[in-house]
Structure formats: C-alpha cells, structure tokens
C-alpha cells in the first residue's frame, strides 16, 4: 500500500529512464507487492480470481527483465511488525465487511433486475389497458334505456369465448414450487433412508436359480395356491434351467453317460420337460386360448389366423373375400342424413376460432344481437344458403348473384303476400319463423349513428329484447290504429359476412353523425319537410299520419355493403339520406312500418327473366336496406311493438353518388286492414348541394382538428419513448455501478496465501534467480541492500520504500512506455527540501502500513499542515491546536491563516486518535528489522525442462507455448554473455553525481493548490535537514544564514574554483573578496553573531576549515 497519495506529491521529481540503459544493473525487486498486484488486478469479468495468475505474471515479468539484461534480486516479506499486524487486523475486519458487502451487493443486483422486470411488466400492462380503453371508447355506446334479453345466445357465445386452443408446449402446473426442486427434500428424489430400504429389499431376496425345480409338482394344490407372480417366476426359471447342461462340462457328461443312447434319452426328457413348461407358461399368459386373431388387413379382404383343431394342429391363415355383391348397400335416408349432420355439427362445434388474448375484448350488446340475428338468418334461409365456412369464402360475384336471385324471389313472395286476406295473413304469420323486436325510446341522433357501424357490415344499431325459444311475434293492440305490421327478421337479400373480432382502435376520431351539418339539416321541423317534396297518398287514413307531434325514435337497418363504402365512413363523402326525416317534438313511441315498393321489382323480375337486370334506382351490386316507417303512438303507452314481416328491398345508392334519389313512382299501395301510409320523397339537387357545401367545410375543420390531435399524439409518444430510454439508461448505469462495486468487493475480500508465495519462489529457482526472505518488511530490506551497495536500485510500487531510507527507486517498469520512472532522494531534497523525516510525518497524516492516518486529509492538506506546523514537534502542536478547535477554546489568533480556516471547517469530520502522532511509527521506519549480510548475489541459468514441467502443472501450458516465449529470451541471454554488449558513456559518470545521465522533464502541475503547497514547503528551511558544515560556516562568516538554493549553489561553485587553483595569498584575498561580495551592504558594526536569527545554528569554529584544507 505505502503512503496514501505520496506518489502524487513526488511526481514532479521523476526522471524518465530508458530500459536499454539498465543493462547489467542489479535491481532489488519487491516480490510481495507483485503477488498482491496480480491477486487484485488480474480477474475475470465477474470479479473472480483467475487461477495461477501470479505464476503467469511472474513468468512474463521475469522474461522481460532477462531480455533487457537486468539482474534482479527478489525480496519477499517476512513476519509483519506489531504495528503492521494491528493494521492488518483492521483491514481484515474491513475485508470481512467487504465479503458481507459483496453478498449485499449481489442481493441489490438481483433486486434491481427484478424491479426492472416488474417495471417492464407494469408498462406492458398499462399499454394493454390503454389499448383496451381506447377500443372501448371508440365504440359507440348504446343508450342505458335499451335492454337486451340474451338468455338464448349467451351459452353459445360463452362456449366460443371460453374455448382456447391448447398450447402444445405449455407444461402442466406443478404441485411443488421451484424452490423445493433439487433440494434434499425434493419429492422426486429418493431420500437416503428410502434408498437404503430399497437396496436392502433386494439383498434379502434369495436367488431363485439356486432352487431345484426337478421335484416340484406344478399340478399340486400347493403350487396352484401361490400368487400369480410367484408361479410365473418359478415357471420361467424352471424353463430356463431346463435349457442348461446342469453346469457340467462335456467330459463330465461323458463320464455320467458312457452310453450315447442314455445321453440321447436324457436330452429327450429335458426337451419334453421344457416343452411342458413352455405350454404351462402359454396357458398361464393366455396364449393358448382359442379364437381368431387378425394379422393383416386389406380392402375388401379379411385375413384371419385360425387354430387348426385337427390332429395335425397348428394355425391356418384364412382369407375372406369382400366383393361388392356381399357388401351391404347403405341407403341414405332422411334419418341417416339428419344424424350425420348432427354428428358433423358436433364435430364442428368442438373447435372455434378464438381471438388472441392480448387483443380480445368482451362482446358488447350490439355484437350479441348481431350473433343472434346471424343464427336466425341461418335457420330462416337454410335451404337457400350454404354453410358459414362456404359463405365466408365466396366471391363478390357469387354474392351479387345470390342477392339478385333472392330479391327476385322475395318480390314474388311480397306480391303474393299482399294478395292474401287478413285470416290467411295471420295463418302465414304463425307458420313463419320470425323474431320480436322490443323497441324503447331512442334519441334521433343515435339512430343515424347506426348507418355507419362497421367497415364491412352495417349492423342493427338499436334493437330491443330478443325473445326465447319460440321466436314468435308477441301481439300487441295499439290504441290508435289497432293494426299489426308483419316485419321479417332480416331482408333475404342481405348476407352477413364474417366480421373481425379484433377491433383495433381507430387512428382518428369516429364521425359523429349527430353533430354533423348533414344531420342538423335533417332535424328541421315537420312543416318544412311537409312543404317540400313529400307526397302523402290520399288513401292513408287520418289516424295514420306519419308526422304529427312525433320524433324519430328508431331506425332499424341491416345492410351488407362492400368495401367501396369504406370511404363514406370517415369522410362523409357519400352521405346516406334516408327517406325518413325526423320530426322534433314531444317524445312518443312510434310504430315501425316497412315500405315495399312493388312496381320496380316487377320490372326487375321481368328483366331478370330476360337475363338482364337493370337497377331503376342507379344502385350498385347487392347493397340492400330495409327502411321502417314510424307512425305515432300514445306517449304513455310503453308496451311492445308488434311487427309483422313484409319482405322488402331497400333501394340502395351508388357510393359515387353524393345523394339518394328516390323516384316518385315508388309508392306503397295502402291496404284497408293495414292502416299504413306509403311515402315517396325526393330531395331537390339544390338542397343537397347546399348540404354538401356545408358538409365540406365541416370536414375541413374536422381534418384540421385531426391533424392537431395527431401531432399531440406523436409528441406524447416521443416523450414517453424518451422517458423509457432515460429509464433504461439509468437502469444500465445503476447496473454497471453495482457490478463494479461487486467486483471491487470480491477483490478486496481475497488475500495472499503461502501457496502463492511458494509457487513464485519455485519459479525463481527454476530461472536461476536469487531471492531472499526479509525478516520483516521487503521494502526495508531493499533499502538496506541499496545502502550496502549490493544492488544498484529498487523496483517497487510501494512508496514506503522512501520512508525506510530508499534513495533510488524505479517505478512503472512494465508499462507500455519505453521509459521507466526514476525517483531520487537527492532530487526531493534539492527541489522541495523534503527528507525522510518529512515523509514519515506525511505518513502520520495520510496513513500507511503502520498507521491509519486521518480521515478527510489528502496530500495537499497534509503538506499545508506540515508547512503550518514545522519542526520536530509540529504534529504535536497541530494536535493541541486541533483539540482547542474541537473543544471550542480556540481564540481568533488560532484561526488567522487560510490553512487554519480551511481546517476549522473540517473540525467535525476529522478525528484525531488518542495516540496521534504515534512515536512507534517513527521508530518502525527509522530502525526496521533487516538482514545486514554483505554477501553478494549469484545468478544462474534457467532450467528449460523443469520450467516446462512446472508451467504444465501449474498453468496448463503446453511445451510449444512455453517455448514460444522462453526460447528467444534464453538465446538472447547466451548471446549477450558470450558476445558481450557495448558500454555506454553514462556509466563513467556514476561517481559522486549519478544524476547527469537521466535528465528531468519539465513538469506541469495539475493542481494549483498542490503547486503552492510544494513551493511554500520548498522555501522553508527544515530543521531535520541541516545544511552542510561548510555552507553553514560560510553563512556564519558573512552574518547571514540563508538556506536557499541560490546561496548553496553559489558557494559550491566558488569552492570548486578554489580547489582547482594553487594555494597562495592572492588566492586567499580573492576568496575573501568573493565572500565579501556575498555579504549584504550593511553597516559592518552591526554584523555580529548575536544579531543573527536564532533559528539558524551558527558555528564560528568552521570559518577556518576552508583555509586549512587549502594549506594542506
């Protein structure tokens, strides 16, 4: 570890050195810190330690040192000092916390991922809910006053809704949770007791083959009383034993049966016994039971294996020919057809198309009614229609032909219907399968909404209750007219297509016909309508006025249109103008009557007989619609409306035509017993044109609003997407932080073991490199080796080496750069006036292997504290001053500098230990336990074979991979040993000054505050690093005690000049003149030793030393 942040302080004094200049240098290497680095740094992605990473790291670094010709000496840590053991214990406590924190972090990771999954699930649920709500809102709501009796159609619909196609890959639910699976109490796995009991059950069973079956009477009552399993086992074992030779060899059998005939008789007896046992087994298993058994099958033929009852026995294969004459002829009668249809229907009902769960929705009442109507239509027109599946697949042309044909047939039926009398009418009514529509009060605005209901089908919008099984009309007497109308369930020309159950929300707002300009024009009073193009036949009775104090309550229409009406739905480009216009007045119930114009259909029938059909109304394809007229009724009467069916076909309109033009000759002949009025109406082109102009303006306004709504929708989606991206980014960032924290906690939890140290030492022995184990600290031993000149430098990344007295340290030797960082203690003294004792003081503040340091104190603040409190007792003075601040007894003078003000703000955060500063820390650094032996080191030759085997055993490297790295290094070593290397010029300058060959680079401080702290520390004269005696004597002689670099450099230059000259009096005078020039211009009478500063120790006895050396 070293001193925290010390490398940052010493970085300005580093020198770059090339690796090529370190040839034949003896370098002491701290091996313990290498192992520590490999343990902490070399890990996998999950933060786990890689196996044998320390061996691989040592091998690579050793090869690099040997390649550059460096002679390393490895030093391992020994026993730790007491102070370090205390620090290690504290760190172990922290390491235990790290292990616990690693578990906590893993739980946090799991919780974060689970929370993320829950957020995604919740977001998906919100989107599904929003989608469902949007689809529900886009659907038109039915009035609350309308009720529906769905007692008949509910079971069928529920059957379709509840049925889901089974997923072949969906596994059944388990009775046991996943937590119990694979555990010791997993019910699928036998426990230890059960396994022991199961094994013991087999060990207790005696081998049945050991018994003698020759004396067993298989027909005895005792044998027959045995269980079937035992009898079968005994018979099987006896039969198998009969095939053996009793375990005797051929020689033994020859001795037992010297006569070959006796041996043959013995074999025949064994054969008879085996056959008897085989027959008993066949009888026991039922194989001998008589009866035919089929062995093969072919059309019109039957193969039967029959047992032969004759004396010859055996089995015979018989063939029975199934010719057509012998086969029965199946007659398809009505009962058979009916039963087959029922079976087919049952088989068809077994499977249904089920919508996707994510897009499905509950069926609203409108869809329930549509389903019921579809069922009624199938029952009513079963002979003229095909099945649903065939109907879904027919083409448009076929639909057109069917619709035209049925409309012609219904035209004929309608003519016959009008020719019937009232009694015949009632009789026909009782025989037809019809249904009842119970209508309630419905606003007129909602009635127009029924015209545009679906993309493909215009369904029945507002209907009443559907009756039960009888599906008959309920008769109701009207108080005013007392008439009943025959209304059919559906127009026979209309054919309902298969609708899509998956109703997606529209990307635009649905058209509200109640608010359109078209419908506003339709809501004019009755008088306006009567004054315009409306003709009421004179045959209509007075009590049957169509428009008299009434409102339009219900328009029931079922229309099947093609996809060419899609444009008319959102854009109102093809409005449907009903011939029935609403009358705004008091709300009253109205009767439904149906217009059935006859003359156009007669013409259509005649044209159809000729082969051509001409639409008198300019209609398109098979689009048909039933229009029901309303007659007034008493408002108080809320009973059911009895409707009798009159088949009619609505004149349909072209989608290309903007309006509906109804000819005036479309009139309904009034019947005396009907009491209904026929209505033929037409709209003037000018009125329609005016309506269309206003409609286009309304459409433009709506499209502009739709554009604005779309922009708002897109912006909301983008904002939501950005929010989701931000949430995802935050999640990824948090996940990355937790993973890094988990890796660091795993790294801090591991520690160096003795096995790692032994493997590294074995590798060094195989390389022939010397290594030693220090008594205590490896850094201290390296410093001692450098002091004894057994090595030329120290290679370590531990800054404690300077505190132990290391003066030449190499750092970052194995990085990618070609330069190594060299730190010299002389540079520290010259540049920053820092010595070993100052570094130890920094260790008290920053923390090291021997002390924990002070919290909230960094390298810059530590330098400022040492500058503010200098001297040997500086740290003690700092402690007293800080205690005054903590207790609140500090005066204003105690906080009179920027540094003290800064420290005053950290009073509650900095905690001083009671033993601070601990003098034992100084003693441990100044006087460590080291080996003082001066025995020189020897370097050997690597053992290639042993290295291969060692790397194979520890790392798993093959011989080829080891040779790829090791052979070039060994070859280069031999080449340098025998050929030699060229000497460089720098080795001749390593006498007194060893720094000339490693020039320093100008350093730019990253922190201005650090630069100021080092500068202030540099200008201060340290009491622990006194000037040399000669410099001090010169300062005493001239009445000034400057410890600055300028004074020292000038005096040293002068002394070199003096030493190069011969001793003479003139030289003495010149020296005196030179020294006088250094003296400040002050009064000579004022210069005395007493006037010098106290902090400088003056020694006048050294004034004559230069002259004495000169005389010698």
Curated annotation (Swiss-Prot):
- For the region Disordered, what residue ranges are annotated? 1056-1112
Record-linked SMART domains: HhH2, XPGI, XPGN
Query: Tell me, what's a Pfam family for it?
Result: XPG_N
Q: What ranges does the record give for the region I-domain, renumbered to this chain?
A: 742-870
Task: Please list the residue ranges annotated as the UIM domain.
Answer: 395-414
PROSITE patterns membership: UIM, XPG_1, XPG_2
Cofactor note from UniProt? Binds 2 magnesium ions per subunit. They probably participate in the reaction catalyzed by the enzyme. May bind an additional third magnesium ion after substrate binding.
Q: Where is Mg(2+) 2 bound in this sequence?
A: 798, 800, 849
> Where is it localised?
Nucleus
Q: Which amino acids does the record list as binding Mg(2+) 1?
A: 30, 77, 777, 779
Enumerate the GO terms in the molecular function aspect: DNA endonuclease activity; metal ion binding; single-stranded DNA binding; single-stranded DNA endodeoxyribonuclease activity
Give the coiled coil ranges. Answer: none
According to the UniProt record, where is the region N-domain? 1-95
Per the record, its GO cellular-component terms are:
nucleus
Going by the UniProt record, its keywords in alphabetical order are: DNA damage, DNA repair, Endonuclease, Hydrolase, Magnesium, Metal-binding, Nuclease, Nucleus
Q: Enzyme group, top EC level?
A: hydrolase
In which residue ranges is the amino acid composition biased (Polar residues)? Answer: 1079-1089
Q: Which InterPro entries match?
A: 5-3_exonuclease_C_sf (IPR036279), HhH2 (IPR008918), PIN-like_dom_sf (IPR029060), UIM_dom (IPR003903), XPG-I_dom (IPR006086), XPG/Rad2 (IPR006084), XPG/Rad2_eukaryotes (IPR001044), XPG_CS (IPR019974)
Entry function: Single-stranded DNA endonuclease involved in excision repair of DNA damaged with UV light, bulky adducts, or cross-linking agents. Essential for the incision step of excision-repair.
According to UniProt, the name of this protein is DNA repair protein rad13
């Amino acid at each position: 570890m070293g001193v925290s942040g010390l490398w940052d302080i010493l970085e300005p004094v580093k020198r770059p050195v090339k690796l090529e200049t370190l040839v034949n240098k003896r370098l002491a290497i701290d091996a313990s810190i290498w192992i520590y680095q490999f343990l902490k740094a070399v890990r996998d992605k999950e933060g786990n330690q890689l196996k044998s990473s320390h061996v691989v790291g040592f091998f690579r670094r050793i090869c690099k040192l040997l390649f550059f010709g460096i002679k390393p000496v490895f030093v391992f840590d020994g026993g730790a000092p007491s102070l370090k053991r205390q620090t290690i214990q504290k760190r172990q406590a922290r390491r235990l916390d790290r292990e616990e924190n690693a578990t906590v972090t893993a739980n946090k990771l799991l919780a974060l991922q689970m929370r993320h999954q829950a957020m995604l699930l919740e977001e998906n649920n919100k989107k599904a809910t929003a989608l469902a709500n949007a689809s529900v809102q886009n659907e038109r709501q039915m009035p609350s006053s309308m009720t529906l009796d769905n007692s008949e159609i509910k079971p069928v619909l529920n059957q379709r809704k509840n049925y889901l196609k089974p997923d072949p890959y969906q596994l059944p639910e388990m009775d046991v949770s996943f937590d119990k699976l694979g555990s010791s109490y997993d019910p699928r796995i036998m426990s230890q007791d059960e396994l022991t009991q199961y094994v013991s059950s087999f060990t207790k069973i005696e081998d049945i083959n050991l018994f003698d079956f020759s004396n067993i009477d298989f027909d005895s009552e005792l044998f027959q009383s045995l269980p079937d399993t035992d009898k079968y086992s005994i018979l099987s074992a006896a039969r198998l034993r009969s095939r053996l030779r009793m375990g005797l060899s051929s020689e033994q059998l020859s001795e037992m049966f010297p006569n070959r005939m006796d041996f043959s008789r013995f074999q025949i007896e064994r054969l008879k016994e085996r056959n008897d046992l085989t027959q008993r087994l066949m009888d026991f298993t039922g194989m001998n039971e008589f009866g035919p058994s089929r062995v093969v099958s072919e059309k019109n033929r039957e193969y039967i294996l029959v047992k032969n009852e004759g004396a010859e026995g055996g089995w015979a294969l018989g063939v029975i020919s199934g010719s057509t004459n012998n086969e029965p002829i199946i007659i398809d009668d009505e009962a058979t057809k009916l039963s087959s249809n029922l079976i087919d229907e049952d088989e068809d009902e077994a499977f249904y198309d089920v919508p996707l769960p994510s897009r499905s929705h509950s069926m609203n009442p409108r869809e329930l009614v549509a389903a019921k109507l579809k069922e009624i239509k199938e029952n009513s027109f079963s002979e003229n229609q095909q099945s649903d599946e065939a109907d879904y697949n027919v083409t448009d042309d076929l639909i057109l032909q069917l619709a035209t044909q049925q409309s012609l047939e219904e035209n004929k039926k309608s003519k016959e219907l009008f020719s019937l009398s009232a009694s015949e009418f009632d009789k026909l009514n009782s025989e037809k399968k019809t249904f009842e529509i119970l209508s309630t009060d419905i606003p007129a605005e909602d009635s127009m909404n029924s015209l545009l209901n679906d993309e493909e089908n215009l369904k029945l919008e507002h209907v009443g209750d559907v009756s039960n099984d009888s599906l008959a009309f309920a008769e109701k007497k009207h108080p005013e007219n007392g008439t009943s109308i025959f209304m059919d369930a559906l127009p026979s020309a209309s054919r309902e297509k298969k609708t899509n159950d998956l109703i997606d929300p529209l990307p635009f707002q649905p058209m509200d016909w109640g608010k359109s300009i078209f419908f506003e024009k339709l809501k004019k009073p009755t008088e306006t309508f009567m004054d315009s193009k409306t003709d009421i036949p004179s045959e209509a009775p007075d009590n049957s006025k169509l428009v008299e104090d009434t409102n339009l309550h219900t328009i029931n229409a079922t229309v099947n249109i093609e996809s060419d009406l899609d444009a008319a739905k959102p854009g109102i480009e093809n409005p449907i103008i009903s011939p029935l216009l609403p009358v705004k007045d008091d709300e009253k119930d109205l009767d439904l009557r149906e217009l059935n114009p006859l003359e156009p259909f007669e013409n259509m029938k005649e044209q159809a007989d000729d082969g051509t059909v001409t639409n008198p109304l300019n209609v398109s394809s098979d689009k048909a619609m039933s229009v029901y007229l309303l007659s007034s009724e008493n408002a108080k009467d809320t009973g059911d409306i009895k409707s009798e069916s009159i088949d009619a076909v609505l004149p349909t309109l072209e989608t290309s035509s903007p309006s509906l033009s109804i000819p005036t000759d479309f009139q309904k002949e009034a019947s005396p017993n009907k009491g209904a009025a026929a209505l033929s109406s037409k709209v003037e082109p000018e009125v329609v044109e005016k309506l269309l102009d206003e409609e286009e303006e309304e459409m433009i306004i709506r499209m502009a609003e739709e554009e604005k709504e779309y922009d708002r929708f897109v912006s909301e989606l983008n904002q939501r997407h950005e929010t989701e991206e931000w949430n995802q980014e935050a999640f990824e960032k948090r996940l990355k932080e937790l993973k890094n924290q988990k890796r660091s906690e795993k790294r801090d939890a591991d520690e160096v073991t003795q096995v790692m140290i032994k493997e590294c030492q074995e590798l060094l022995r195989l390389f022939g490199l010397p290594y030693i184990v220090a008594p205590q600290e490896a850094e201290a031993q390296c410093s001692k080796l450098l002091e004894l000149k057994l090595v030329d430098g120290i290679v370590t990344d531990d800054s404690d080496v300077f505190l132990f007295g290391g003066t030449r340290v190499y750092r970052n030797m194995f990085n990618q750069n070609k330069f190594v960082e060299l730190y010299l203690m002389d540079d520290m003294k010259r540049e920053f006036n820092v010595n070993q004792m100052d570094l130890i003081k920094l260790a008290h503040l920053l923390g090291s292997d021997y002390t924990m340091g002070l919290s909230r104190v960094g390298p810059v603040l530590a330098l400022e504290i040492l500058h503010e409190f200098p001297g040997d007792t500086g740290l003690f003075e700092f402690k007293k001053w800080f205690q005054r601040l903590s207790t609140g007894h500090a005066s204003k003078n105690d906080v009179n500098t920027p540094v003290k003000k800064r420290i005053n703000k950290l009073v509650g955060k900095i905690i001083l230990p009671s033993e601070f500063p601990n003098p034992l820390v100084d003693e441990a650094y100044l006087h460590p336990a080291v080996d003082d032996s001066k025995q020189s080191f020897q370097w050997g030759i690597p053992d290639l074979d042993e290295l291969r085997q060692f790397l194979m055993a520890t790392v798993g490297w093959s011989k080829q991979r080891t040779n790829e790295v090791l052979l070039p290094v060994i070859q280069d070593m031999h080449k340098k040993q025998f050929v030699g290397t060229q000497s460089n010029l720098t080795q001749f300058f390593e006498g007194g000054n060893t720094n000339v060959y490693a020039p320093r680079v100008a350093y730019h401080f990253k922190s201005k505050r650090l630069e100021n702290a080092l500068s202030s520390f540099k200008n201060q004269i340290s009491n622990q690093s006194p000037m040399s005696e000669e410099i001090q004597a010169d300062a005493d002689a001239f009445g000034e005690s400057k410890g600055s670099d300028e004074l020292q450099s000038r005096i040293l230059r002068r002394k070199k000049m003096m030493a190069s000259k011969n001793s003479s009096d003139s030289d003495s005078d010149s020296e005196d003149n030179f020294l006088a020039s250094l003296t400040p211009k002050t009064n000579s009478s004022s210069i005395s030793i007493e006037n010098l500063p106290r902090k400088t120790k003056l020694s006048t006895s050294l004034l004559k030393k230069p002259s004495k050396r000169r005389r010698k």
